[in-house]
Every structure is written in C-alpha cells, then in structure tokens.
C-alpha cells in the first residue's frame, strides 16, 4: 500500500529555529505523567469550545461508523490489478541461513514512485480478516524452545537484517530510476464532507511489470510467521485517519515532514483493543500520544506523521514516527498485525525518502525499537516490544526482515508476493484510467491559498492521472488549497474545506478563481460595523457561505479575534451580537482613534496594508549591521547611517504589513533620526525620568554618559580624584529593570548606573537598650498559606488535628495536648484559621490545628550568645522546647536550682526570652526570668560594614526599609517573597542584624536578617513510604545498576536502592544535598563572580553578563547553565564555540562574521561542526553572548522545564516511581550533585533553592 500525495507530501512550513517547536514539546512525554500545560497554546483561541466538544465526541466514538470514508489516490501512481495466472509464481525463497548475511553490505536504493502492490477493494475502512479459517498449522511449541538459537542474529554479522551482497547486484540491475518525489501514502477521512468519492471505487489497473524483470526476495532470518504471511499473500488494510483536532503539532528537529525513522512499540496491555487504546490516548494525550496503532485487522493513524508525537521520550520524540502494536491472541491475528505493521512502516520509509536500516545493534538507523532508543539515546527507559514479540515466538529481527522486504517490493526492487515470473504482462480488466500514466514529469508542492470552483468546470479528480473528473456541486464556494501539482502541461490544485480540512479532490487550474493567502493570525481588536453587513463562514466567502447578517440599528461593535490576508485584502473573524463569522476589513471602522504619523505621507505607498502607529517610551541602540534609516515606513530601502551603537530615545512604533519600525530621536534634543526596523535595534522599555535630590558615593574612574544606558560612543567623562567621591543626583530613570541617575561629581555631569553608586554611611547614633519582648500574637486570616514563625501550646480540650485544612473531620489530638510546638504555616479556611504544627526539631510537620485550640505567641529569631548564668532557686526547670509545658521538662526546677547554666543561643517568645544551653550535662531551654547574669552587659551598635552575600527572602509578611530600624518608611516584602536579595552591607542595631542590598527589581533597601535565609528548602510529601518506592525501583525489568567493582556493572538490590533514595540521609550531606537543587530557579549570582569563575574558559571568559541575562530571561539556574556550556564546548575552546561560518555548505573558520554555538544545539553526530554552525547562523548568533542567551531558551525548554527540575527527580521520579528516569546508575544523581556543588564552591556561592521529597 502506497501513501497518497493528497495527504502526505509535507507542507514544509518554515520554522524559526530560535525557540522553535522542535524543543517546545513536552520532552518527557510518554515516560511520565507530567503536566503539559505549556502546550495549551496550540489550541486556536477561537475554536477552543468547539474543539472541546468535538474532542468529547471523538473520544466517545473513536474511528467508528466510517464505512463511507473517502479514499484518495496517489497522483503519481497507477496501480496494477494482480492476475490469477498460476504459472511460475514468484514465491519468496524459503529459510536462508543467517550466516549468509553480510551486515556491511547495504542496498542504497532511492525512493521511487513505482508500486506494484494493489489496494484491496473495500466498502469499509475496516479490512476483512484475511484467511480467518486458517489453522495454526505453521506454529509449534518447538519454536518456543529454540527461538533464540534459530532466529538470533549475530550483531557483528548484521546491521540491517536484509541486505545480502547477492541481492545487492540483482536489485541494482533491476531497479528503475528513482523519481524525484517520494511516494506518499493513502489515507481515509474520518468524517467526509462530500460523497463525490466512494471508498469502494475499483482501483485502476495498468500493464504489470514484466514477470522476469524482478528477482525474488531472499529472507535473511528463519520465520514461520513471515512464511505464513508470504504464503497467504496477506494484504494490509487501508490506512484509516482518526486525527484529533486538539493534539499539538510541532516540527521534528529537522523541520516539518522530516522524521528520521520509525519506532516499534507495543501497548503492553493484553486486555485492550485498538479502539480502547485510542480512546485512552485521547483522554490522556498530555502524557503521551503516538502516530498510529496497528492490530490484526486495522491500521489507524491518530496523528499526522509530518509532525512529531510524544511517544518515546525527550530525545526520540523530535526524531521518530511512533507506532503501537495492539496485542492479539491467536496465531493468524498476530501474523496479520505483523504484516500490517511492516506494511505501514515500509510505507512511511518510502514516503519520506528513508531506507530501512536497523538501529537495534549500533544505535544508528531508521528502524528502532523502544528498547533501542532507551539503550542508545536515553530520555526513556522502556524495553518494548521484545517481550510481546517473544510471547508469540517472534522477534524484532523477523519483523525488520519483513519491513525490509515490504520496502523493496514497494520500491520495485523485488517481485511482489504472488506475482507470475513469466515475461507476459497481466491483462488489465476494465481499466478506469489509461493503461499507462502520462509521461510528463509530476511535481507536487505545498500551497497556502484559497480558490473558488467555477460553475463551468471539468470536475473533481481523485488523482491527477485521471482522464476525466467527477461532477461536483461544490461550485462558487471558497475552499482552502493545500497542494499544487503539475503533470506535463496541466496544473492542479488540491482543495479542501476551509474549516475542517476535509479533502474534496484535485481541480484544474483553469477551473478555479485562485488567490494567495497568508496564514491567519490572532488579533484582539474592536471595530464598528453597519447593520445588515453579512458575515461569512470563511474569508473571501460567497453567497453560499453566509453565516448571518449584523442585526440592530446604528453601528454595532465587532470584536475581531483572527485576521487573514487574501491576496491584498484583509479579512477578520469575530463576533457581533452573538453571531460569528468573517468580514472584509473594508466594511469595518477602527474604533480606536488613530495616532498621526510624525513623517509626511508618501505619494505612492508600496502596500495596501493598514498602517498602525502608536506612541512609545523606550530606548534603542542601532545594531552595527542594519537596513538603514527610513524617512517613512513606506520606503522600500533605508539610507545608510553611522548612528550605530548609540542609545537613542524611541517615541513611536509603527506596523506596516509584516514589518515593525521604531522612530528614534536624539535623547537630549527633539532632533528626529528616522525610522528603523525592529530587527535592527536592541530595544528596552523606559519609564519617564523623575527628579530626585539624593547623594551617593562613587569610585574614581567610573564613567559618566550623556544618556542613560549609554555606550562607549556617548561617554561624558570619568570621575576624578582619589577615594570615594560625592555624586549629587538630580534625575533618575528606569531602563528595563536597571536604574540610572543623572548628577554631578567634581564639576562633571552625566548619567551612571545605580549599580556603581553607594549610599553614604549614616552617622553613628546612640541606640536604646534592646527590647527582648515580641509583640503579642494576633489572629490573622490569610487567604493563602502563609509562612510564619510562631509557637503554640495545645489546649487540653481541643477539636483535634487535621492532615489538611480541607478535612471536615479531625483526628483525635489528645496526645498533643498540654505540649508546645513550633508553628510554621498559617491559613484561613472559611471563617476559621488554622496553623501547621511542627515537632521540636522544626523539620517534621505534624498537622493542622484550629487556632481556637491553641495558645499562640510570636517566636523571634534564634540569636547566638555566649553567657554563663546562675539558675534561680525558684525556676520552672529545663525544657525540651522554649515555653515548654510540664510534659516537656527534662530536669525539674529542684535539679537545676543554684546551678551554672551555659547559654549558647536565645529566642524571644511573646514578651519572654528563653535561653538554650547546658546544665548538669543536659541541654535544653530555660526562661530568662529563671536566670541571673553575673554582670549586665550593655549591647552595642556596630557600624555598617561591607558584606557581600545573596540571601533568599523567606518572609512575605515582613518589610523592607529605607533606613534600618524605621517604623515609618517601610514597605511590604510580599511581592519579593522567595526571591534573591543581594546584600552589600551589614549592620547590627539593638541586637538586630540588618542587611542592605538590592531587591530583584533593582531597588536598594534594608531588610532584617530574620526575614532572610541562606537557602530556601521546600519539602513535598510523596504519599508513599521509602520501602514502597524502593521496592518499585528494585522490581523493574531493567534493574537499577551499581558498580561494586570499578568498571563492572551489577544489579542493585533492594537495600542499595533504598539507601540511594533516602532523602533524609541525602539532605544531611552538604554535597549530596545538591541533587535537590532546583535547576529552574535563577539565583542572581553577581556578574563579577561568574566572570571570575569563567576566567580562562576560552570564549566564555567575561560572559558573566550574558549568562546572568539568560538565567533571568528563561528561568534557569546559572550554575547549571554554565556547567552545560562548559561541558559542550570543552571549557569554551571548541571550534563550535569559537565560531565559524557555513558558505556553500562548507565550514569557514576565518570568515569576517562568525556564528557561535555554545550548547551544541543541533550539532548532530554525523557532522556536528557544520550542523551546529548552520543552526547558529540561522538563529543569528554572531556573538558569543547571543549564543548564550539564545541557546538558553532551548536548554530551558528541553531539560529543566519538563517537570523533573532536580537531579533527584530526574533519577528517581518520586511522583511516578519507576517511569521516565534519566539513568539506571543508582549513583547518577550523587555524581552530578558533587559536580554542581564543586562549581558553586569555585564561584564562592551556595545553592539557594532546594526541593526535597519526603516519604511517609
């Protein structure tokens, strides 16, 4: 069965490789139940509701009742009808000894449009079972015993299971010349819109190939099942299409319509059917979906093979077609399913111009098993279909041999099954088409246009070879055109329904009115429209496609959501008064008041597209390479300019057609420079300047600029003098997220980044005695879970403890009564407020209590102290916890009275202070009221000192201050919670440590040390015990591996796995803890520190700013990003990183312009340097910094944005143990954690964000 041009010729839509969908897909799909919400944007916003309803219907009734499905024939192929001449049957030679196979000899046949296999006549898309009454005579239990010995192929002898040297000569001699276009595949439509074409149409017949012109195929493995298939001349059924509209469509890594091979899967479900599998997949497509399913009776394609699917993990998804074999249970059904799979696989290979090449033994080729992908490529850990095939006494090698044979038959290299071997051609029976196709060359190309069929026409053609067309009533309607075909002097268009995509057929060029069309784009704009204006179901619609008319009196509001250009006219789709449809923009009036352009209108505009102009407040620097300055946006070409690499003000932006322009002017004067194209500038948003009166210190040598964000061409001078100088600022402006100040220093004026300024140290003041009391606790009702620092005593009579605030019934809380616990979280639910109690070690949450059942006080920050005290005669004893009850006493008051208490830390509880220390060789807490200090020590206030460290803000309920210890000038930290805070100064006032530094928005502020943390650790409950998850891992078919002897891998046992997975143990290790580091969270490591680390790292040296920008822009941990780049570039020394150009498809390393690739993106193994540079050139990475920032988007989407965002999750996947795991080595996460920890040590930083799973 051959694929048909109607469906399978790729449209080859051009993709912008920078951030293209080749990596945007859910890279781990089919291996884990990750959230796929990042792909929801593939749904057309105007059709979400409709497609959702359609999806429900499709799932409820998949691929059924479609016996009237249309069949579209390949325009390039005329199919012969097989005759029943019994003389000289070209049956395939029987079992050939595997020793004959020469794995180094490969048949290099090219794709051809010849196909001698007929399509069976059928009135249903479900092909009838072939030979249903055949017994299992060919099957014996003996085969089960010697499956391995008989059918096992020596990987040293064979690479591709059907490529003997003997056949190579025969096939070359007999092979026809390959056509320029690969043969497409035949398809069926699930919901035909017209009945012009019948699914039961008799295939056309032509004179057969001479019977002696083709050799017999010699099987390369012994297979009773393959012999059974050949002997019974089993035919594959038609390919049914059951596409689902809401499945995403992403390109393969090489582009749309460019898969690199096919992967064999089995469903691993003995009790499911093909309909059941498809229905399940549609309901769970966010986790996985494949291209097709095959069983003994049907081949159902569920997703277009021109686009990737989510079936084989991160590495394989962008490369391969994925097809599932549905389990069957008897000999004949299994044989039919193997025949069907082999036919479908051979069809795909033929169509896409690929040759069979098994990847099973070396990881290179076009035919893969899921196991081979797991073994050689990774990104998945499945091992199918080997187990299922073995259960039927079959093997992959036998299936590959069948695929190879099918391919050679389709390519006209070997004789089809059942054909006669004499040279007498078969006689065609009642051909409906000429006995021989046109000798004219056929060319087919993708098209994106629209057409209306004229009332007088030649009809619709099933293929472009048809002598006559079939009459049609689909005239004077607008259809989408998806392909153009030229055969000889005739040109045809393939027309389809605009909204559903259902194919109608081919029409001659002279029978239509054709217009070019651009792809629709989403818009959000309102217009006014007159009553009575007609809406249409399609753009450029006719009177037969009216969707309704605008009702009401007076102008109505038309809300447009989509726009498409047909020829030079614009059509918009939208809604008005409850009716939706398309209307020409000529009937609409923009409700927004247009802003006049600042330049004269041209006398002869070059386009009819509407010009939109809007005010803008930004700044831009013109790139060294640009299209020049434009006097008006209508100008065809710009004028060369020397005003490059300078910062200008941007006052307006304009859009005309597909181009966007900025109007740039001199920053300090009203002088207009001209219009520049968007791609020719580096643009940043800017806020309006504001006047300030502030004084800073600035270091000598700091450069001043004539404009904010100025370049080296706009320097106004440098700060003179020795020692810090005083900079008096009078103006401030924010550019993007950076603050620039204009001021004067030593008689020079100019702009400088706030990062180069420091606030002068405040004069010392006398400070009051520190207060030990903490404000009394008051109940608040947070709407979300809040992190708090409090302490609580559980009342004897309480309503119980809850695992969640949503639990209606609490469990008995008697064992917690009359005890003190730490409170870490607080949440309101309904009219009640609950708090989360933790045990005395702070680490283990116990459950939620209603605050009505507690006595709660605020808990201060623990402060280190070194002091000896004498315990008063009357005291409350030594307790396990501050403010502990009698049930938590370690030593009674009598046991510690008059003793010496050595305190090491203290904490405030409400108005009391508790000290922690040692007495009588026991440690615990004592109320400060029960202690007497030998002498009172008056606290002192330290001067502010330099202190460089990046903390994490941990208290969203806290405040940041303009000056420390101020009760008035303070602002909420809620917006900055869990964000980094880069500290530059430290000061202690009244016993409280304050830090001065930069918030994530660039603002400088003071924050209490109690509101900061060196690291932010979050614990997530898995809902399982450690024993449970370890048992799952240890019980996998492919066991976790361990090296007990260096270089020798063995299966890890249960105890090995449990030890490796123990998160409590790992979290205590300072290095191994880094396997919990969040790789999707930037840490704001300073550029200086990054540059220090990158010193001597080749072209990556001094690229700290680029890594910092990339981390912030795409949400990636800087250290992880840097480690990735160092690994890929050999510490920045590879030629790929140093840069080159590709000219005439050759790498040029000494070119003036070089393109860089620092992450090895698209550097495929066959030619990594050329391919990697080609990708970089297409992406425009002509500097190392561009390669870092641009490549980071790829890295983020491909690796750390797929849900498993820590090394531990990558290795063990605690959310779904045993599935989608990156490695089998139980030490993999430990090794990589130590590497990343080592990088942090070299940079002089520590990890900030950790996510630790917890087991019950």
Swiss-Prot record:
GO terms for molecular function: amidase activity; mannosyl-glycoprotein endo-beta-N-acetylglucosaminidase activity; N-acetylmuramoyl-L-alanine amidase activity. GO terms for biological process: cell wall organization; peptidoglycan catabolic process. SUPFAM superfamilies: N-acetylmuramoyl-L-alanine amidase-like, Prokaryotic SH3-related domain. It is an enzyme of class 3 (hydrolase). Residues 103-138 have a biased composition (Polar residues). Residues 199-775 are annotated as: N-acetylmuramoyl-L-alanine amidase. In the N-terminal section; belongs to the N-acetylmuramoyl-L-alanine amidase 2 family. In the C-terminal section; belongs to the glycosyl hydrolase 73 family. Endohydrolysis of the di-N-acetylchitobiosyl unit in high-mannose glycopeptides and glycoproteins containing the -[(Man)5(GlcNAc)2]-Asn structure. One N-acetyl-D-glucosamine residue remains attached to the protein; the rest of the oligosaccharide is released intact. Cleaves the peptidoglycan connecting the daughter cells at the end of the cell division cycle, resulting in the separation of the two newly divided cells. Acts as an autolysin in penicillin-induced lysis. This is Bifunctional autolysin.
